[in-house]
Amino acid sequence: MSEPKNYVLVTAAYNEEAHIGRTIESIAGQTLLPQRWVIVSDCSTDRTDEIIRRYLAKYPFIRLVRIEEKHARNFGAQVMAIHRGFEQLSEVDYEFIANVDSDLSFEPTYYSKLLQKFEEDPKLGLAGGFIFEQGHDGVFRSRVLNTEKSIGHAVQMVRRECYEAIGGWVAMPYGGQDWVALVTAQMHGWRIKAFSDLPVYHHRPTGGGDRRFRNLFREGRMDYSVGSYPPFEILKLVRRFVFPPYLLGSFVRLWGFLWGYWHFERRPVSREFVQFLRREQKSALRKIFLHGKTKESLPDSSSLYPEPVRADEFPSAKPPANHNA
Protein backbone atom coordinates (compact mmCIF):
# COMPACT_ATOMS: atom_id res chain seq x y z
CA MET A 1 0.00 0.00 0.00
CA SER A 2 1.41 3.42 -0.98
CA GLU A 3 2.17 6.08 1.63
CA PRO A 4 -0.45 8.80 2.19
CA LYS A 5 0.12 11.86 0.04
CA ASN A 6 0.87 15.23 1.62
CA TYR A 7 -1.56 17.99 0.75
CA VAL A 8 -2.19 21.57 1.81
CA LEU A 9 -5.31 23.73 1.68
CA VAL A 10 -5.85 27.46 1.21
CA THR A 11 -9.11 29.33 1.91
CA ALA A 12 -10.05 32.95 1.30
CA ALA A 13 -12.80 34.02 3.70
CA TYR A 14 -14.78 37.25 3.92
CA ASN A 15 -17.51 37.62 6.57
CA GLU A 16 -18.17 33.89 6.80
CA GLU A 17 -19.28 33.63 10.43
CA ALA A 18 -22.35 31.66 9.35
CA HIS A 19 -20.35 28.95 7.58
CA ILE A 20 -16.65 28.85 8.49
CA GLY A 21 -17.13 26.76 11.65
CA ARG A 22 -18.89 24.03 9.72
CA THR A 23 -16.15 23.98 7.10
CA ILE A 24 -13.41 23.74 9.76
CA GLU A 25 -15.20 20.86 11.49
CA SER A 26 -15.57 19.08 8.16
CA ILE A 27 -11.87 19.41 7.30
CA ALA A 28 -10.82 18.46 10.84
CA GLY A 29 -12.96 15.35 10.52
CA GLN A 30 -11.10 14.06 7.46
CA THR A 31 -9.52 10.63 7.76
CA LEU A 32 -6.42 12.12 6.11
CA LEU A 33 -5.60 15.59 7.44
CA PRO A 34 -3.75 18.29 5.49
CA GLN A 35 -0.15 19.17 6.30
CA ARG A 36 -1.31 22.76 6.62
CA TRP A 37 -4.45 24.75 6.02
CA VAL A 38 -4.07 28.50 5.63
CA ILE A 39 -7.28 30.49 6.08
CA VAL A 40 -6.99 34.08 4.85
CA SER A 41 -9.51 36.43 6.41
CA ASP A 42 -9.83 39.12 3.76
CA CYS A 43 -10.85 42.24 5.73
CA SER A 44 -13.67 40.40 7.50
CA THR A 45 -15.77 42.66 9.72
CA ASP A 46 -17.93 40.03 11.42
CA ARG A 47 -16.94 37.18 13.81
CA THR A 48 -15.08 35.14 11.19
CA ASP A 49 -11.65 35.70 12.79
CA GLU A 50 -12.95 35.01 16.29
CA ILE A 51 -14.46 31.69 15.20
CA ILE A 52 -11.28 30.60 13.40
CA ARG A 53 -9.08 31.47 16.42
CA ARG A 54 -11.13 29.13 18.61
CA TYR A 55 -9.92 26.23 16.48
CA LEU A 56 -6.22 27.15 16.24
CA ALA A 57 -5.09 25.49 19.48
CA LYS A 58 -7.18 22.39 18.84
CA TYR A 59 -6.00 21.93 15.24
CA PRO A 60 -2.32 22.95 14.90
CA PHE A 61 -2.33 22.43 11.12
CA ILE A 62 -4.54 25.54 10.72
CA ARG A 63 -3.02 28.99 10.22
CA LEU A 64 -4.92 32.28 10.18
CA VAL A 65 -3.75 35.19 8.05
CA ARG A 66 -5.60 38.49 8.12
CA ILE A 67 -5.59 41.07 5.33
CA GLU A 68 -6.19 44.60 6.62
CA GLU A 69 -5.75 46.59 3.40
CA LYS A 70 -9.07 47.72 1.93
CA HIS A 71 -9.63 46.86 -1.72
CA ALA A 72 -12.34 46.23 -4.30
CA ARG A 73 -14.30 43.04 -3.70
CA ASN A 74 -14.25 40.89 -6.83
CA PHE A 75 -13.07 37.51 -8.04
CA GLY A 76 -9.58 38.83 -8.67
CA ALA A 77 -9.35 39.91 -5.03
CA GLN A 78 -10.26 36.40 -3.93
CA VAL A 79 -7.35 34.94 -5.87
CA MET A 80 -4.99 37.59 -4.49
CA ALA A 81 -6.05 36.57 -0.98
CA ILE A 82 -5.28 32.95 -1.84
CA HIS A 83 -1.84 34.03 -3.07
CA ARG A 84 -1.29 35.66 0.32
CA GLY A 85 -2.00 32.30 1.90
CA PHE A 86 0.64 30.63 -0.27
CA GLU A 87 3.28 32.71 1.50
CA GLN A 88 2.70 30.52 4.56
CA LEU A 89 3.53 27.34 2.62
CA SER A 90 7.12 28.02 1.57
CA GLU A 91 8.58 25.68 4.20
CA VAL A 92 5.91 22.98 4.02
CA ASP A 93 6.57 19.73 2.15
CA TYR A 94 3.53 18.88 0.04
CA GLU A 95 2.61 17.13 -3.19
CA PHE A 96 -0.88 18.55 -3.72
CA ILE A 97 -2.51 21.91 -3.13
CA ALA A 98 -6.23 22.62 -2.99
CA ASN A 99 -8.48 25.63 -2.75
CA VAL A 100 -11.41 25.29 -0.35
CA ASP A 101 -14.24 27.79 -0.19
CA SER A 102 -15.33 28.76 3.32
CA ASP A 103 -18.92 27.52 3.02
CA LEU A 104 -18.39 23.85 2.11
CA SER A 105 -18.56 20.49 3.86
CA PHE A 106 -17.33 17.05 2.84
CA GLU A 107 -17.64 13.37 3.61
CA PRO A 108 -14.87 12.30 6.07
CA THR A 109 -13.07 10.29 3.39
CA TYR A 110 -13.26 12.97 0.69
CA TYR A 111 -9.59 13.92 0.56
CA SER A 112 -8.22 10.42 1.05
CA LYS A 113 -10.36 9.20 -1.85
CA LEU A 114 -9.47 12.17 -4.03
CA LEU A 115 -5.75 11.60 -3.46
CA GLN A 116 -6.24 7.96 -4.36
CA LYS A 117 -7.59 9.12 -7.74
CA PHE A 118 -4.35 11.03 -8.30
CA GLU A 119 -2.34 7.97 -7.25
CA GLU A 120 -4.13 5.84 -9.83
CA ASP A 121 -3.44 8.30 -12.67
CA PRO A 122 0.02 9.96 -12.68
CA LYS A 123 -1.10 12.31 -15.48
CA LEU A 124 -4.10 13.59 -13.53
CA GLY A 125 -3.09 17.17 -12.80
CA LEU A 126 -6.28 18.81 -11.51
CA ALA A 127 -9.37 17.22 -9.98
CA GLY A 128 -12.22 17.60 -7.51
CA GLY A 129 -15.67 16.36 -6.59
CA PHE A 130 -19.19 17.15 -7.79
CA ILE A 131 -20.73 20.17 -6.07
CA PHE A 132 -24.21 20.01 -4.54
CA GLU A 133 -25.72 23.44 -3.85
CA GLN A 134 -28.13 24.14 -1.02
CA GLY A 135 -31.28 25.98 -1.97
CA HIS A 136 -33.44 28.17 0.25
CA ASP A 137 -35.56 25.09 0.94
CA GLY A 138 -32.58 23.34 2.58
CA VAL A 139 -32.31 20.82 -0.24
CA PHE A 140 -28.95 20.04 -1.84
CA ARG A 141 -29.13 19.64 -5.61
CA SER A 142 -26.37 18.85 -8.06
CA ARG A 143 -25.30 22.07 -9.73
CA VAL A 144 -26.08 22.45 -13.42
CA LEU A 145 -22.37 22.69 -14.30
CA ASN A 146 -21.43 19.27 -12.91
CA THR A 147 -19.59 17.26 -15.57
CA GLU A 148 -16.35 15.31 -15.57
CA LYS A 149 -14.60 18.23 -17.28
CA SER A 150 -15.89 20.97 -14.97
CA ILE A 151 -14.11 21.29 -11.60
CA GLY A 152 -15.22 24.36 -9.69
CA HIS A 153 -12.56 26.61 -8.17
CA ALA A 154 -14.19 26.02 -4.79
CA VAL A 155 -12.83 22.45 -4.74
CA GLN A 156 -9.94 22.33 -7.19
CA MET A 157 -7.01 20.18 -6.07
CA VAL A 158 -3.84 20.43 -8.16
CA ARG A 159 -0.78 18.22 -8.32
CA ARG A 160 2.19 20.40 -7.38
CA GLU A 161 4.04 19.81 -10.68
CA CYS A 162 0.90 20.82 -12.56
CA TYR A 163 0.35 23.85 -10.36
CA GLU A 164 3.87 25.11 -11.01
CA ALA A 165 3.54 24.45 -14.75
CA ILE A 166 0.35 26.50 -15.10
CA GLY A 167 1.53 29.31 -12.85
CA GLY A 168 -1.15 28.77 -10.23
CA TRP A 169 -4.55 30.41 -10.19
CA VAL A 170 -4.78 33.62 -12.19
CA ALA A 171 -6.74 36.62 -10.88
CA MET A 172 -9.69 37.21 -13.23
CA PRO A 173 -11.86 40.32 -12.68
CA TYR A 174 -15.15 38.61 -13.64
CA GLY A 175 -14.33 35.12 -12.38
CA GLY A 176 -13.24 32.15 -14.42
CA GLN A 177 -9.99 31.38 -12.62
CA ASP A 178 -11.15 27.78 -12.39
CA TRP A 179 -11.78 27.67 -16.15
CA VAL A 180 -8.37 29.20 -16.88
CA ALA A 181 -6.66 26.64 -14.63
CA LEU A 182 -8.49 23.75 -16.32
CA VAL A 183 -7.62 24.88 -19.84
CA THR A 184 -4.02 25.75 -18.99
CA ALA A 185 -3.49 22.37 -17.34
CA GLN A 186 -4.65 20.65 -20.52
CA MET A 187 -2.41 22.91 -22.60
CA HIS A 188 0.52 21.50 -20.60
CA GLY A 189 -0.55 17.90 -21.18
CA TRP A 190 -2.25 17.19 -17.86
CA ARG A 191 -5.58 15.44 -17.47
CA ILE A 192 -8.45 16.98 -15.52
CA LYS A 193 -11.48 15.30 -14.01
CA ALA A 194 -14.38 15.86 -11.62
CA PHE A 195 -15.53 12.71 -9.82
CA SER A 196 -19.25 12.09 -9.37
CA ASP A 197 -18.59 9.70 -6.45
CA LEU A 198 -17.03 12.52 -4.38
CA PRO A 199 -19.86 14.88 -3.35
CA VAL A 200 -19.13 18.34 -1.97
CA TYR A 201 -21.86 20.31 -0.19
CA HIS A 202 -22.13 24.06 -0.77
CA HIS A 203 -24.16 25.58 2.07
CA ARG A 204 -24.73 29.12 0.86
CA PRO A 205 -28.20 29.38 -0.74
CA THR A 206 -28.04 30.38 -4.38
CA GLY A 207 -29.08 33.96 -5.08
CA GLY A 208 -32.24 35.08 -6.80
CA GLY A 209 -33.88 38.13 -8.33
CA ASP A 210 -31.66 41.05 -9.30
CA ARG A 211 -28.56 39.36 -7.90
CA ARG A 212 -29.08 36.39 -10.21
CA PHE A 213 -29.26 38.65 -13.27
CA ARG A 214 -26.17 40.57 -12.19
CA ASN A 215 -24.32 37.27 -11.86
CA LEU A 216 -25.47 36.16 -15.31
CA PHE A 217 -24.27 39.43 -16.84
CA ARG A 218 -20.92 38.99 -15.06
CA GLU A 219 -20.67 35.41 -16.32
CA GLY A 220 -21.15 36.68 -19.87
CA ARG A 221 -18.29 39.11 -19.38
CA MET A 222 -16.25 36.25 -17.94
CA ASP A 223 -16.92 34.14 -21.04
CA TYR A 224 -15.65 37.00 -23.20
CA SER A 225 -12.60 37.55 -21.00
CA VAL A 226 -11.34 33.98 -21.51
CA GLY A 227 -11.94 34.12 -25.28
CA SER A 228 -14.86 31.72 -25.64
CA TYR A 229 -15.69 30.93 -29.30
CA PRO A 230 -18.89 32.90 -30.19
CA PRO A 231 -20.80 30.04 -31.94
CA PHE A 232 -20.00 27.78 -29.00
CA GLU A 233 -21.17 30.45 -26.57
CA ILE A 234 -24.46 30.90 -28.42
CA LEU A 235 -25.20 27.17 -28.51
CA LYS A 236 -24.34 26.88 -24.83
CA LEU A 237 -26.78 29.66 -23.99
CA VAL A 238 -29.51 28.14 -26.17
CA ARG A 239 -29.19 24.92 -24.19
CA ARG A 240 -29.64 26.90 -20.99
CA PHE A 241 -33.07 28.20 -22.04
CA VAL A 242 -34.59 25.38 -20.00
CA PHE A 243 -32.92 26.46 -16.73
CA PRO A 244 -34.17 29.29 -14.48
CA PRO A 245 -34.49 32.16 -15.14
CA TYR A 246 -35.91 30.63 -18.30
CA LEU A 247 -34.89 32.21 -21.62
CA LEU A 248 -34.22 35.65 -20.12
CA GLY A 249 -31.17 34.39 -18.24
CA SER A 250 -29.48 33.31 -21.46
CA PHE A 251 -30.10 36.70 -23.05
CA VAL A 252 -28.64 38.50 -20.02
CA ARG A 253 -25.51 36.35 -20.17
CA LEU A 254 -25.25 36.92 -23.94
CA TRP A 255 -25.51 40.67 -23.30
CA GLY A 256 -22.55 40.40 -20.94
CA PHE A 257 -20.60 38.40 -23.52
CA LEU A 258 -21.23 40.98 -26.26
CA TRP A 259 -20.40 43.84 -23.89
CA GLY A 260 -16.72 42.95 -24.13
CA TYR A 261 -16.79 43.23 -27.93
CA TRP A 262 -18.68 46.52 -27.89
CA HIS A 263 -16.17 48.05 -25.46
CA PHE A 264 -13.03 46.48 -26.98
CA GLU A 265 -12.03 45.03 -23.61
CA ARG A 266 -8.58 43.48 -23.35
CA ARG A 267 -8.53 39.85 -22.30
CA PRO A 268 -6.33 38.91 -19.32
CA VAL A 269 -5.30 35.61 -20.96
CA SER A 270 -2.71 34.93 -23.65
CA ARG A 271 -3.42 34.52 -27.36
CA GLU A 272 -2.18 30.93 -27.07
CA PHE A 273 -4.76 30.28 -24.37
CA VAL A 274 -7.60 31.63 -26.54
CA GLN A 275 -6.43 29.59 -29.53
CA PHE A 276 -6.28 26.38 -27.48
CA LEU A 277 -9.68 26.99 -25.88
CA ARG A 278 -11.33 27.69 -29.23
CA ARG A 279 -9.81 24.56 -30.79
CA GLU A 280 -11.34 22.53 -27.98
CA GLN A 281 -14.70 24.26 -28.37
CA LYS A 282 -14.71 23.81 -32.15
CA SER A 283 -13.94 20.12 -31.62
CA ALA A 284 -16.88 19.94 -29.20
CA LEU A 285 -19.16 21.55 -31.77
CA ARG A 286 -18.12 19.01 -34.41
CA LYS A 287 -18.97 16.17 -32.03
CA ILE A 288 -22.36 17.71 -31.37
CA PHE A 289 -23.30 18.15 -35.01
CA LEU A 290 -21.80 14.85 -36.19
CA HIS A 291 -22.75 12.60 -33.29
CA GLY A 292 -25.22 14.57 -31.17
CA LYS A 293 -23.08 14.19 -28.02
CA THR A 294 -24.17 17.32 -26.22
CA LYS A 295 -23.66 16.21 -22.61
CA GLU A 296 -20.16 14.91 -23.16
CA SER A 297 -19.13 17.83 -25.34
CA LEU A 298 -20.38 20.97 -23.65
CA PRO A 299 -18.86 22.04 -20.32
CA ASP A 300 -22.10 23.07 -18.65
CA SER A 301 -24.19 19.99 -19.10
CA SER A 302 -27.47 19.42 -17.36
CA SER A 303 -27.42 17.76 -13.97
CA LEU A 304 -26.25 14.18 -13.78
CA TYR A 305 -28.13 13.85 -10.50
CA PRO A 306 -31.82 14.53 -11.17
CA GLU A 307 -32.93 13.60 -7.66
CA PRO A 308 -32.24 16.18 -4.92
CA VAL A 309 -30.60 15.12 -1.66
CA ARG A 310 -31.27 16.53 1.80
CA ALA A 311 -28.66 17.70 4.29
CA ASP A 312 -29.77 15.25 6.98
CA GLU A 313 -28.82 12.31 4.73
CA PHE A 314 -25.14 13.26 5.04
CA PRO A 315 -23.58 13.71 8.51
CA SER A 316 -20.80 15.95 7.14
CA ALA A 317 -23.42 18.34 5.76
CA LYS A 318 -24.74 19.11 9.25
CA PRO A 319 -23.26 22.18 10.96
CA PRO A 320 -21.65 21.44 14.35
CA ALA A 321 -23.75 22.62 17.26
CA ASN A 322 -21.21 25.25 18.33
CA HIS A 323 -20.15 26.65 14.97
CA ASN A 324 -21.99 29.90 15.58
CA ALA A 325 -21.50 29.98 19.33
Task: Give the ranges of each region predicted by the language model.
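Short, acidic, metal-binding catalytic loop of nucleotide-sugar glycosyltransferases
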Residues: 25-34
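Short beta-strand-to-loop acidic/aromatic patch adjacent to the donor-nucleotide binding site
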Residues: 93-105
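A conserved acidic beta->alpha catalytic loop
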Residues: 41-50
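A recurrent flexible, glycine/aromatic-enriched loop bordering the glycosyltransferase active site
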Residues: 139-158, 218-223
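Active-site nucleotide-sugar/metal-binding loop of Leloir-type enzymes
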Residues: 79-96
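Non-catalytic, C-terminal membrane-associated alpha-helical segments of glycosyltransferases
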Residues: 214-314
